[in-house]
């Protein structure tokens, strides 16, 4: 202390005075216990203050002291105390080690950082080369944030643009990770990046990712921002089902666990900048506690928004000079960076056990928190020191034993000194001066990668420990003056430095600190290298490289990459090691190719060939598909021998050498020579005896070789003498017996050498037999293939026949053979053969064998002497044997392997198979090839035999070397962002679709092009009004014209010519608009705003920029003079109702405000005076254009057709309009059936024209009916029917169906052969009558698997007294869905028709009928999802006898109805929709003021609307129930309420403001106790009685019928069936004024995926019928979807299916209009659906889309399959958004991200393409293009006659109940439109 400062109190006063004087505090504000940061002391203030204190106290005071002692009291106490001993932290007490301290091995790493760093090796090179990746932000990165308001633009301009950025962050291999493009677009690119890098890290570790499936593998991923998620959610209209998972931080870890199916912990860690090092710490803990057995620790960081840059800029944290200068005096902040790193961790003992490469060992780690330090973001030196001590205690290591620390080192003026002081205090002090602690920071190379910073430093340190070198810390020139490096015994590594020699393993630490105060430190140590055991590392002579990928293109890319690597960085890696890693440390993939090579040169050449898809020695390209099961070994006869065969196999294939050695004794005994010596010496076999014995010995050894690699025969076939080897392999003979047979045969034949010959002819058998007819000594000896035969006979005659064949230009050649068997010359040898082999005792074969000795292939030969005597004489029926094997009744075989030294039969085999089974897939292989490398050839053929998975290869000892990881095939995936005004995609200008204007320079000397871009949104249209056509908003033609006219004006033009309107612009969803002017052409196009760059643009209008302003003005005046004067006989008419005229033509609304002042019409002219609004901006042309275009279309009021603009010859602009009134003069120049042509002039009264259109052509749209209507309308045309909600209401009218009834006398008895399975109640009687009708019935489910017809007779009684209607429905539903599942899995060529029988549901009087009623709804959905197996549903009368119904059912089965039929008194009725017409029977609904009304589901969106509707009708008391309770009323004002709760509360308050008392009750309406409690409570309180009910409760769960489960069905049926039954019992008929059941049209329309929901709603329909018959005003309202509300709010599938049928959803206003209308009629079930335009109006039926585009029946089978594959590939690729050429026909759709919505869309397109109805589960049952094409080929191909009737019936129907109803309404009799 100095004299002026004598102690702690003086120092405290001095500090207070200093702050008051220099910081600007008042004495009252200075709290000695408040942190200095809170008192306003900044980092730079601390530097100045430390200098003042150093001078005052005469000792060094560091700015760091202010962070260690952050208050005035703490700092004063510290500075007044004696200085601590410099070595006080030199040692850390070593704790006892235990299992929780077990070392952790780093076994794999992967990384992606800027600067082209894509792997750890690239990072190491980058660091050693002292490179930096820092640059300015890529231009496109912040584009979405530019062009905003001035204050935003100014802030962005002031934000630093320095950073370390990854390129192409929008690139991702979505296909590889089985993610659809749509989902990938919404995924945070951090998720995508981590997926790829994690896969690379696992491959680097040598762990095939597929092997981790369902393992206890943990994922710990550090990440701290999801800027992408924020960007994606900025535009609410773009939020979809993928958005939440795409933007959630947790999914960064979870998605990796999901993709790899990992079952260990999956945790996203956010501790800001220390996230990834904390992730490593948590991973180590999880391994030590055995929560997981393998851990993947990661960190990822991307910088997408300038917001965080701006925030750090504001606190001075970012370097203005763009460099991280850690520990340097010029440090001025950090630079933000991007990247990702992943490490794979195991317990060290596990890694050693598994032979893994141990890159480094984690000895210990620690994590702690700053707590309340000198500010939330301020570092705490004490906490940093504490985490260091804890880490080294955990590691069991003295701090002085660490050699290097990878510091956090951000490069800030005070952050660096604080960290250095902590490191020096704990780790540096006590070291020798010549052995300082070395420190550095990777941030000086890569910037601060924040959430990935810890793992970046960790990977760098592991690499340094591995290499024994430490890369330099960049930008370190002058030490930071606030860091006493010498005192702290520390040194910054400023050059490439060899690791210090310390006598112990290399050791290092890694630090990382989060800006919120979470600190982490990890201690690592050099790993011990694992070497193979001595003698086990010998390289094989030949290596097989398996190159795998998910597609052929990926295999090609991987092969090319490997070839490049092996010639470059991997040149020193042994070929065997490369093969080892590829074959045993990479995941199996669907496609793979192989390369067999003896040396590196051969391997590289093979890889290049594989990459190019070319053939080369040793190369097997990926198979296009599997040939199917079943392997046949084919043993050829003589002719395959060659000198040198087998020699290399003896040397390099142990299994072959062992087989030869085992065979050698018996071989020598029978042959008299050594097989081993002949093969080993490469000797030539001479003479028939040597040749035949040598070949069978070779064949038996080759068989063992194949079997040693796991390829074993399921069947064997022998060709001629090859049948001996086949018999041995089959187990009929021993090898010794086989050799004996061969020796005997060859010895007997030897004397005949040279006495006969054989010839191979390119002729089929009949032709050959005709050829040799004149040569009795010549025989057809071998049936080789359909095009090849072999003849045998005297040599001279054979030569003459060869000459004859060659004269016909056909192939013919002598066979090189000593003795010709299979001809009469063998007759003399047969007795001796029988005699010498008489004692042969063959066994029963253990492997199947087809003998080629007999013409009858079903002969089961005994391989005795007689057989072998016959074998040498009879012809060889090889062709027949192969054909039988390839198409046998017991199952076909698909892989044929010729066991020989050279292939003789492979071509004959494949010719035979393809001839017998065209289009089937087979493989025919040899074994060896003459004069080639035996081992390479065999291994190549071995690889060809493996088409499903790679062949087994030897697994050498570990460890394996790393090789390059999987090459990615990136495509762009990014959201369509909502740009600010003024930027690309800005909102269009008022009245036009023009947006931002860009001038595009051209290469040539031609003028520049011009581009205007805008974003059109439904809620921000550029015109004030609306313009709806059939309820769909369409951009008016006037706006389109105004757009291109305005663009022309900007370019100096005032006229357009050759205007052509091509497509309307629908404004019901956002679209991107582009206007392009190129030279004199101008066009307007649009595309979906939510699409991708590959989406198709639709062109809407084109035109030519024509005349100069002066030209157009003169032409305009001339045109006005010619057309603007009305004729003398013109007269002024009454002004018509413009809105009515437009409505008659289907148009609702005007886009601009203008009115008609006068209307003067004559024969061909019309002059209309129009008034414009006074507020119209001067020069606005839009309203004038709009008036002109609309009025021109109405130039003939008597013509009620709709006219749409088609073209304009010329349109010119003149002077601007200055007054509010103008006149539009229309001169009709042409009028025909196709349309009208009009000249138009617009001018202010008495002024020159302002607008002229010459030859404005309109095209007429005629709907085929008169759409004009009288008052009231006598009939309804399609336009009004689609717009007037009262026309939406229909009942179901049951009309007689012309189906023959076999019960009528004289009915023809028809026999319909085919098995029938009958399931359910009272089936015996039905069986008896069906059997009499010619069917083959089977009771219960015995015959379901083979039945052509399946009849399900529904139960009528519950299973027990306690079974409720819900229980009953769930039970029966489960039975039927299981039945559908079974039938759907049957082959397409074995179709079945499913029928369901119910009783009494039509009337629903009996309780049993009500119980069964749900089946009607389920039936419609089965019909929609599985039209191929649906027959129909028949409802019998409640007392009908099933036995009597049998004959009628027999007739129905013959032609499935696809519908619901009702049979009463012998008459069959079918449903049709009938509109509700006539005089109402009831008055409008009025509620009683003294009653209450119950709405179940009343707190939902629909329920609250219905509550409002009842209030409009006088209801004063409402009881609203819902499953979720509202909060207490005292909490209704809380800001914490979510949006949905707030909406409900606001709606209730609005009702209460109207004087309505609302009682909101939480109750489960399906629970009888809940409803009883509600009613009991009301009774106790004396509440008003409930006089009306709306049952609106319900939930849905979209599931295909084949996927429905009992639990899911119960969940849906509970509120509907259970709830309605409870209410029915509580409020019996007569107790209420009305009982409305809000059901769904899904119950009758058959919407796919709505099985449970449709079934539940059909029950409501039946209950309404039942109560109505009891006199209660009960109505079931079968709605289509309410637009944007209720259960269909997000049901895209429902909307798409409605659109497919020609219908649509309805608005709430339309719904209530329809409700009020139908409530006046006596209707129990009202179907509320907008009807489509009548079928046949355009000459086609409602299902014209099902007309086949091709006549499949006239096409060949192969052509059908090819056409189907091409068409389906195109359809599926378009929906999945993948390039068609990249869609592998064998790739499962699920791997491409197929979901149910996509499947439905594909199904619709496929139906149009194929021309038949298809199942909803089609894509899931046939999950590849190839399998789907094969399935459909069976559906469309001709069938046998016995199936024709059924197949046509199954495929010709419309398939959906909705289609059927829409069809029938057109044929409904007049009485159907009766008053109901």
UniProtKB/Swiss-Prot annotation:
GO biological process assignments: Actinobacterium-type cell wall biogenesis; fatty acid biosynthetic process; phenolic phthiocerol biosynthetic process; phthiocerol biosynthetic process
Region (N-terminal hotdog fold): 997-1112
Residues that coordinate or bind NADP(+): 1491-1551
Alphabetic keyword roster: Fatty acid metabolism, Lipid metabolism, Multifunctional enzyme, NADP, Oxidoreductase, Phosphopantetheine, Phosphoprotein, Repeat, Transferase
Residues covered by region (C-terminal hotdog fold): 1130-1267
O-(pantetheine 4'-phosphoryl)serine, modified sites: 43, 1796
A Gene Ontology term for the protein's cellular component: polyketide synthase complex
UniProt xrefs under InterPro entries: Ac_transferase_dom_sf, ACP-like_sf, Acyl_transferase_dom, Acyl_Trfase/lysoPLipase, Ketoacyl_synth_AS, Ketoacyl_synth_C, Ketoacyl_synth_N, Malonyl_transacylase_ACP-bd
Ranges of compositional bias, category Low complexity: 1106-1115
Positions of the UniProt region annotated as Acyltransferase: 626-950
GO molecular function terms listed in the Swiss-Prot or TrEMBL record: 3-oxoacyl-[acyl-carrier-protein] synthase activity; fatty acid synthase activity; oxidoreductase activity; phosphopantetheine binding
Cofactor(s) annotated in UniProt: NADP(+); pantetheine 4'-phosphate
Gene3D superfamilies listed in its UniProt record: 3.40.47.10, ACP-like, Malonyl-CoA ACP transacylase, ACP-binding, Malonyl-Coenzyme A Acyl Carrier Protein, domain 2, NAD(P)-binding Rossmann-like Domain, Polyketide synthase dehydratase
Active site annotation, chain numbering: 273, 408, 448, 720, 1027, 1186
E.C. number(s) listed in UniProt: 2.3.1.292
Carrier domain mapped to chain residues: 9-83, 1759-1836
SUPFAM superfamilies per UniProt: ACP-like, FabD/lysophospholipase-like, NAD(P)-binding Rossmann-fold domains, Probable ACP-binding domain of malonyl-CoA ACP transacylase, Thiolase-like
Pathway: Lipid metabolism; fatty acid biosynthesis
Region spans: Disordered: 1102-1130
Keyword match Oxidoreductase: yes
Segments for region (Beta-ketoacyl reductase): 1491-1728
Function in brief: Part of the PpsABCDE complex involved in the biosynthesis of the lipid core common to phthiocerols and phenolphthiocerols by successive additions of malonyl-CoA or methylmalonyl-CoA extender units. PpsA can accept as substrate the activated forms of either icosanoyl (C20), docosanoyl (C22) or lignoceroyl (C24) groups from FadD26, or a (4-hydroxyphenyl)-C17 or (4-hydroxyphenyl)-C19 fatty acyl from FadD29. PpsA initiates the biosynthesis and extends its substrate using a malonyl-CoA extender unit. The PpsB and PpsC proteins add the second and third malonyl-CoA extender units.
Name this polypeptide is given: Phenolphthiocerol/phthiocerol polyketide synthase subunit A
């Amino acid at each position: 202390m100095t004299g002026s400062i004598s102690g702690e109190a003086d120092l405290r006063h001095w500090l207070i005075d200093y702050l008051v004087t220099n910081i600007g505090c008042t004495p009252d504000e200075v709290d000695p216990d408040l942190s200095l940061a809170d008192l306003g002391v900044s980092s730079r203030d601390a530097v100045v203050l430390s200098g003042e204190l150093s001078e005052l106290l005469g000792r060094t005071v560091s700015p760091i002291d202010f962070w260690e002692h952050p208050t005035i009291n703490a700092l004063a106490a510290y500075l007044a105390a004696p200085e601590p001993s410099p070595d006080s932290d030199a040692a850390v007490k070593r704790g006892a080690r235990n299992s929780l301290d077990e070392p952790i091995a780093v076994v794999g790493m992967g990384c992606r950082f800027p600067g082209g760093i894509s792997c750890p090796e690239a990072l190491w090179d980058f660091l050693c080369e002292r490179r930096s990746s820092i640059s300015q932000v890529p231009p496109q990165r912040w584009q979405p944030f530019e062009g905003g308001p001035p204050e935003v633009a100014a802030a962005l301009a002031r934000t630093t643009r320095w950073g370390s950025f990854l390129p192409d962050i929008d690139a991702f291999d979505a296909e590889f990770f089985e993610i659809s493009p749509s989902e990938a677009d919404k995924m945070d690119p951090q998720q995508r990046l981590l997926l790829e890098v994690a896969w690379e890290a696992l491959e680097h570790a040598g762990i095939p990712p597929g092997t981790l499936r369902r393992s206890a593998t943990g994922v710990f991923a550090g990440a701290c921002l999801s800027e992408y998620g924020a960007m994606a959610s900025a535009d609410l209209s773009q939020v979809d089902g993928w958005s939440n998972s795409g933007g959630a931080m947790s999914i960064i870890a979870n998605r990796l666990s999901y993709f790899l199916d990992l079952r260990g912990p999956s945790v996203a860690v956010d501790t800001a900048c220390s996230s990834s090092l904390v992730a490593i710490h948590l991973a180590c803990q999880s391994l030590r506690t055995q929560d997981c057995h393998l851990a993947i620790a990661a960190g990822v960081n991307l910088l997408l928004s300038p917001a965080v840059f701006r925030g750090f800029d504001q606190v001075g944290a970012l370097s203005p000079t763009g460099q991280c200068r850690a520990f340097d005096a010029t440090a001025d902040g950090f630079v933000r960076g991007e990247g990702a790193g992943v490490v794979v961790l195991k317990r060290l003992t596990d890694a050693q056990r598994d032979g893994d490469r141990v890159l480094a060992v984690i000895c210990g780690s620690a994590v702690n928190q700053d707590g309340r330090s000198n500010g939330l973001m301020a570092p705490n030196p004490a906490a940093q020191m504490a985490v260091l001590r804890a880490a080294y205690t955990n590691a069991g290591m003295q701090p002085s034993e660490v050699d290097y620390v990878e510091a956090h080192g951000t490069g800030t003026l005070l952050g660096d000194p604080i960290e250095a002081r902590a490191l020096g205090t704990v780790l540096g002090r006590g070291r020798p001066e010549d052995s300082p602690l070395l420190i550095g920071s990777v941030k000086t190379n890569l910037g601060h990668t924040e959430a990935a910073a810890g793992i970046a430093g960790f990977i760098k340190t592991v690499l340094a420990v591995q290499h024994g070198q430490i890369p330099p810390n960049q930008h370190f020139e002058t030490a930071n003056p606030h860091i006493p490096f010498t005192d702290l015994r520390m040194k910054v590594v400023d050059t490439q430095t060899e690791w210090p020699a310390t006598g112990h393993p290399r050791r290092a630490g890694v630090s990382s600190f989060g800006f919120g105060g979470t600190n982490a430190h990890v201690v690592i140590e050099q790993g011990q290298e694992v070497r193979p055991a001595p003698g086990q590392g010998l390289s094989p002579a030949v290596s097989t490289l398996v190159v795998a990928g998910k597609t052929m293109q990926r295999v090609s890319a991987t092969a090319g990459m490997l070839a490049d690597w092996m010639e470059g960085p991997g040149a020193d890696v042994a070929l065997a090691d490369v093969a080892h890693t590829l074959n045993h440390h990479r995941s199996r993939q669907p496609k793979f190719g192989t390369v067999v090579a003896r040396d590196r040169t051969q391997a590289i050449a093979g890889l290049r060939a594989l990459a190019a898809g070319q053939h080369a020695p040793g190369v097997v390209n990926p198979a296009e598909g599997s040939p199917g099961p079943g392997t046949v070994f084919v043993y050829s006869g003589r002719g395959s021998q060659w000198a040198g065969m087998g020699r290399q196999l003896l040397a390099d294939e142990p299994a072959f050498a062992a087989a030869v050695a085992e065979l050698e004794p018996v071989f020598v005994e029978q042959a008299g020579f050594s097989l081993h010596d002949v093969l080993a010496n490469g000797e030539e076999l001479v003479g028939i005896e040597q040749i035949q014995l040598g070949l069978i010995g070779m064949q038996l050894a080759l068989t063992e070789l194949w079997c040693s690699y796991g390829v074993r025969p399921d069947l064997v076939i022998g060709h001629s003498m090859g049948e001996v080897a086949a018999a041995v392999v089959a187990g009929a003979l021993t090898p010794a017996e086989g050799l004996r047979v061969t020796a005997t045969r060859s010895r007997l034949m030897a004397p005949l050498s040279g006495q006969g010959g054989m010839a191979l002819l390119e002729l089929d058998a009949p032709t050959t037999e005709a050829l040799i007819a004149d040569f009795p000594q010549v025989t057809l000896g071998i049936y080789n293939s359909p095009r090849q035969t072999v003849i045998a006979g005297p040599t001279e005659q054979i030569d003459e026949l060869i000459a004859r064949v060659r004269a016909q230009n056909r192939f013919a050649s002598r066979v090189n053979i000593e003795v010709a068997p299979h001809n009469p010359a063998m007759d003399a040898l047969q007795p001796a053969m029988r005699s010498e082999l008489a004692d042969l005792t063959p066994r029963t074969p253990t492997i199947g064998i087809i003998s080629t000795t007999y013409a009858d292939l079903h002969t089961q030969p005994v391989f005795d002497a007689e057989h072998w005597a016959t074998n040498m004489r009879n012809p060889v029926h090889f062709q027949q044997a192969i054909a039988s094997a390839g198409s046998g009744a017991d199952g076909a075989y698909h892989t044929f392997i010729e066991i020989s030294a050279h292939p003789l039969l492979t071509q004959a085999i494949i010719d035979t198979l393809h001839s017998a089974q065209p289009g089937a897939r087979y493989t025919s292989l040899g074994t060896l090839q003459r004069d080639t490398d035996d081992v390479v050839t065999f291994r190549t053929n071995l690889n060809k035999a493996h088409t499903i998975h790679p062949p087994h290869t030897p697994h050498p000892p570990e460890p394996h070397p790393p090789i390059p990881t999987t090459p990615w095939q990136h495509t762009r995936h990014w959201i369509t962002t909502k740009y600010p005004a003024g930027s690309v995609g800005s909102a269009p200008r008022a009245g036009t679709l023009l947006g931002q204007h860009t001038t595009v320079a051209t290469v040539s000397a031609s003028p520049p092009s011009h581009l205007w871009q805008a974003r059109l949104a439904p809620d921000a249209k550029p015109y004030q009004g609306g313009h709806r056509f059939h309820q769909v908003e369409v951009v008016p033609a006037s706006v389109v014209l105004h757009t291109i006219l305005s663009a022309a004006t900007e370019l100096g033009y005032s006229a357009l010519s050759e205007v052509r309107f091509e497509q309307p612009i629908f404004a019901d969803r956002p679209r991107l608009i582009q206007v392009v002017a190129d030279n004199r052409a101008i066009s307007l196009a649009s595309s979906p705003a939510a699409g991708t760059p590959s989406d198709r643009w639709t062109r809407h209008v084109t035109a030519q920029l024509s005349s100069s302003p002066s030209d157009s003005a003169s032409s305009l005046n001339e045109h006005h003079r010619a057309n603007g004067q009305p004729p003398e006989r013109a007269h002024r008419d009454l002004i018509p109702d413009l809105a009515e005229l437009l409505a008659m033509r289907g148009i609702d609304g005007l886009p601009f405000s203008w009115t008609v002042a006068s209307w003067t019409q004559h024969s061909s002219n019309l002059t209309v005076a129009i008034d414009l609004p006074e507020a119209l901006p001067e020069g606005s042309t839009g309203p004038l254009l709009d008036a002109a275009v609309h009025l021109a279309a109405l130039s003939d009021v008597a013509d009620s057709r709709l006219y749409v603009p088609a073209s304009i010859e010329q349109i010119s602009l003149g002077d601007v309009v200055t007054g509010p009134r103008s006149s539009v003069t229309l001169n009709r120049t042409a009028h025909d059936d196709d349309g009208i042509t009009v000249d138009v002039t617009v001018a202010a009264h008495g002024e020159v024209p302002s607008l002229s259109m010459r030859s404005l052509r309109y095209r007429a749209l005629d709907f085929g009916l008169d759409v004009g209507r009288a008052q009231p309308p006598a009939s309804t045309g399609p336009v009004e029917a689609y717009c007037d909600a009262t026309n939406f209401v229909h009942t179901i009218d049951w009309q007689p169906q012309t189906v023959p009834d076999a019960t009528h006398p004289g009915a023809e008895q028809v026999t319909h052969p085919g098995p029938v399975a009958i399931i359910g109640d009272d089936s015996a009687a039905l069986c008896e009558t069906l059997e009499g009708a010619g069917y083959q019935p089977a009771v219960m489910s015995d015959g379901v698997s083979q039945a052509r017809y399946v009849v399900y007779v529904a139960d009528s009684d519950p299973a027990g007294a306690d079974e409720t209607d819900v229980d009953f429905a769930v039970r029966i539903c489960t039975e039927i869905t299981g039945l559908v599942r079974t039938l759907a899995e049957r082959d397409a060529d074995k179709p079945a028709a499913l029928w369901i029988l119910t009783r009494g549901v039509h009337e629903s009087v009996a309780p049993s009928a009500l119980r069964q009623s749900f089946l009607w709804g389920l039936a419609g959905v089965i019909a929609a999802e599985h039209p191929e197996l649906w027959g129909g549903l028949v409802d019998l009368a409640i007392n009908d006898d099933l036995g009597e119904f049998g004959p009628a059912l027999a007739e129905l089965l013959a032609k499935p109805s696809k519908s619901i039929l009702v049979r009463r008194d012998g008459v069959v009725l079918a449903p049709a929709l009938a509109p509700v017409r006539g005089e109402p029977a009831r008055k409008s609904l009025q509620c009683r003021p003294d009653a209450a009304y119950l709405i179940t589901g009343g707190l939902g969106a629909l329920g609250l609307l219905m509550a409002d509707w009842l209030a409009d009708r006088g209801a004063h008391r409402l009881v609203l129930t819902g499953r979720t309770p509202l909060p207490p009323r005292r909490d209704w004002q809380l800001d914490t309420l979510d949006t949905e709760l707030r909406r409900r509360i606001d709606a209730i308050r609005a009702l209460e403001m109207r004087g309505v008392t609302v009682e909101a009750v939480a109750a489960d309406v399906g629970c009888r106790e809940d409803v009883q409690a509600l009613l009991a409570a009301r009774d106790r309180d004396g509440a008003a009685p409930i006089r009306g009910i709306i049952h609106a409760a319900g939930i849905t769960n979209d599931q295909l019928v084949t996927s429905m489960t009992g639990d899911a069905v119960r969940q849906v049926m509970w509120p509907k069936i259970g709830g309605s039954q409870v209410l029915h019992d509580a409020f019996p008929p007569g107790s209420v004024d009305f009982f409305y059941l809000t059901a769904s049209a899904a119950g009758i329309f058959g919407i796919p995926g709505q099985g449970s929901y449709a079934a539940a709603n059909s029950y409501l329909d039946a209950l309404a019928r039942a109560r109505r018959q009891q006199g209660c005003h009960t109505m079931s309202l079968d709605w289509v979807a309410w637009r944007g509300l209720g259960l269909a709010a997000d049901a895209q599938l429902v909307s798409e299916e409605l659109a497919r049928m020609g219908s649509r959803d309805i608005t709430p206003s339309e719904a209530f209009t329809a409700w009020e209308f139908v409530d006046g009629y006596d209707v129990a079930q009202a179907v509320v659906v907008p009807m489509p335009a009548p079928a046949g109006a355009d000459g086609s039926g409602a299902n014209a889309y099902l007309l086949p585009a091709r006549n499949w029946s006239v096409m060949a089978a192969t052509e059908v399959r090819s056409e189907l594959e091409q068409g389906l590939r195109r359809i599926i690729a378009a929906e999945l958004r993948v390039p068609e050429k990249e869609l592998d026909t064998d790739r499962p759709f699920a791997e491409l991200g197929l979901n149910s919505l996509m499947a439905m869309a594909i199904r619709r397109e496929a139906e149009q393409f194929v021309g038949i109805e298809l199942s909803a589960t089609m894509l899931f049952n046939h999950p590849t293009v190839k399998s789907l094409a094969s399935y459909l080929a069976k559906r469309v191909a001709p069938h046998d006659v016995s199936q024709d009737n059924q197949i046509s019936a199954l495929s010709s129907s419309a398939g959906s109940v909705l289609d059927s109803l829409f069809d029938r309404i057109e044929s409904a009799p007049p009485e159907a439109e009766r008053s109901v």
